[in-house]
């Protein structure tokens, strides 16, 4: 009998019923809520006279719309200038209070981006099914959990029934073997993967990351990679459970305790793909070939190593690709064959559910220490992923390093990742961003986003352009 993949095992563990149409009813262990995709779901419960099926399976926190300046946060809900944003945050508070759901409210130290808060609280555990009304829920797959985003109607379904109807996906494995070169990070791995397979490469697949380079990553690095599985076309990203996974989860608030912990660890150790498991697709990369990456266009697959030049549509034979490159160059204000290192930056954003954890901030601070933000850079933001990450960074003195260098040290939230709060790009502005999407207008109408690692973003901030971060730091 052929072995099972990690995805196969997780699916079978949670399959309640297989339906005649080929879909299945899947049990959901953890549901994370935020202010944007939950209001209609709660209203649906009220209209139907229902209550959440399992209240303790849900946690909530506002993140997308919250302001990130200290003054705005101290002002409370009334200080949220945008009326829609204010109503959404207030409505989440009211809904969680009404239905008895645990919420880390805007000024709770535990508040933050949903995909940072879940793991740091231990609300995300190996072997779980985890859903949230946000596509980057794939982040939680770093723990050997089956995690994916859902729509607003599905948020209501989970609240009401603790189950979802889903169709099983195919299995894809991305193997990254070898040692990463100095200065190359998890963000560079996943950008290189997307550059290789494209944004449709993982369509219809659960994407498991494996290989020695993945095993060498910390859990925070693995979260970065699983986070951007979505940009590779997959709905699910996974990394097998190992001793690092278990060590990260141990003693966190929601983690099992005592004998329950021992039983859980025994079960979790089986959350790996069997040696003889067969994947529908296998993609391989050599870690030593990966360099610091920079996206140049309007899709995450439009990415290059920092020492390369922007492509020339004139030499592209595929008419669709030719048109895509031409359009991207026009929107981004770049020229064919322009060196990546010639791209000048207006703003820098270090944050988002991709790269706002303590290791990300440490990496950026290492570059910023003793340097100053370039005079040509209008703004450089550092936005921790949660209040607890912020507190840890401040305990380590990272905030002082950033502030002395000329960065703005902010309160936790999604911030400039998306144009749903006051942190936005102006039209035509180039931003080095540690977020996950560089679509047209993603960070503000007419804004031009370049995806990079935290260290590369910090290097861009202090030089005013893209530079190989390895020119600034020592091994």
UniProtKB/Swiss-Prot annotation:
Enzyme kind, highest EC tier: lyase
Keyword Lyase: yes
One Pfam family named in its UniProt record: Aconitase
Residues annotated for [4Fe-4S] cluster binding in this entry: 353, 414, 417
Cofactor: [4Fe-4S] cluster
Keywords: 4Fe-4S, Amino-acid biosynthesis, Branched-chain amino acid biosynthesis, Iron, Iron-sulfur, Leucine biosynthesis, Lyase, Metal-binding
Record GO terms (molecular function): 3-isopropylmalate dehydratase activity; 4 iron, 4 sulfur cluster binding; metal ion binding
Cofactor remark from the record: Binds 1 [4Fe-4S] cluster per subunit.
One BP term from GO: L-leucine biosynthetic process
Catalytic activity, as annotated: (2R,3S)-3-isopropylmalate = (2S)-2-isopropylmalate
Family statement drawn from the similarity comment of this UniProt entry: Belongs to the aconitase/IPM isomerase family. LeuC type 1 subfamily.
UniProt function note: Catalyzes the isomerization between 2-isopropylmalate and 3-isopropylmalate, via the formation of 2-isopropylmaleate.
NCBIfam families the UniProt entry points to: leuC, PRK05478.1, PRK12466.1
Subunit structure, interactors included: Heterodimer of LeuC and LeuD.
Protein name listed in UniProt: 3-isopropylmalate dehydratase large subunit
């Amino acid at each position: 009998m052929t072995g099972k993949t990690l995805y196969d095992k997780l699916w079978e563990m949670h399959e309640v019923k297989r339906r005649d149409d080929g879909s299945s009813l899947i049990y959901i262990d953890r549901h994370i809520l935020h202010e944007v995709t939950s209001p209609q779901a709660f209203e649906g419960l009220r209209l139907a006279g229902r209550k959440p099926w399992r209240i303790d399976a849900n946690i909530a926190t506002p993140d997308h719309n919250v302001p990130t300046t200290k003054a705005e946060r101290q002002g409370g809900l009334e200080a949220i200038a945008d009326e829609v944003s204010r109503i959404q945050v207030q409505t989440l508070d009211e809904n969680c209070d009404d239905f008895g759901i645990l919420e880390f409210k805007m000024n709770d130290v535990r508040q933050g981006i949903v995909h940072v808060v879940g793991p740091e609280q231990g609300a995300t555990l190996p072997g779980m099914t985890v859903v949230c009304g946000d596509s980057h829920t794939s982040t939680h797959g770093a723990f050997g959990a089956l995690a994916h985003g859902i729509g607003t109607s599905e948020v209501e379904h989970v609240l009401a029934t603790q189950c979802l109807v889903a169709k099983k996906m195919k299995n894809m494995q991305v193997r990254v073997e070898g040692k990463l070169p100095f200065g190359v990070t998890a963000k560079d791995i996943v950008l290189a993967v997307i550059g290789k397979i494209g944004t449709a490469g993982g369509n219809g697949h659960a994407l498991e990351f494996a290989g020695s380079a993945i095993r060498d990553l910390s859990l925070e690095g693995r979260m970065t990679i699983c986070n951007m599985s979505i940009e590779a076309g997959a709905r699910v990203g996974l990394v097998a459970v190992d001793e690092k996974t278990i060590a990260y989860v141990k003693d966190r608030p929601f983690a099992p305790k005592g004998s329950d912990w021992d039983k859980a660890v025994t079960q979790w150790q089986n959350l790996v793909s069997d040696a003889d498991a067969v994947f529908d697709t296998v993609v391989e990369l050599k870690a030593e070939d990966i360099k610091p990456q920079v996206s140049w266009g309007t899709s995450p697959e439009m990415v290059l190593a920092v020492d390369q030049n922007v492509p020339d549509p004139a030499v592209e034979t595929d008419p669709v690709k030719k048109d895509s490159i031409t359009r991207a160059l026009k929107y981004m204000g770049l020229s064919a064959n322009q060196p990546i290192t010639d791209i000048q930056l207006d703003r820098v954003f270090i944050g988002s559910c991709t790269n706002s954890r303590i290791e990300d901030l440490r990496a950026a601070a290492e570059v910023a220490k003793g340097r100053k933000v370039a005079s040509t850079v209008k703004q450089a933001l550092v936005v921790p992923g949660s209040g607890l990450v912020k507190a840890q960074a401040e305990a380590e003195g990272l905030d002082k390093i950033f502030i002395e260098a000329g960065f703005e040290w902010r309160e936790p939230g999604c911030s400039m990742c998306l144009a749903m709060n006051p942190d936005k790009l102006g039209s035509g502005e180039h931003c080095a961003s540690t977020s996950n999407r560089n679509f047209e207008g993603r960070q503000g109408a007419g804004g031009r986003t370049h995806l990079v690692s935290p260290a590369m973003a910090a290097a861009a901030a202090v030089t005013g352009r893209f530079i190989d971060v390895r020119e600034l730091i020592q091994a």
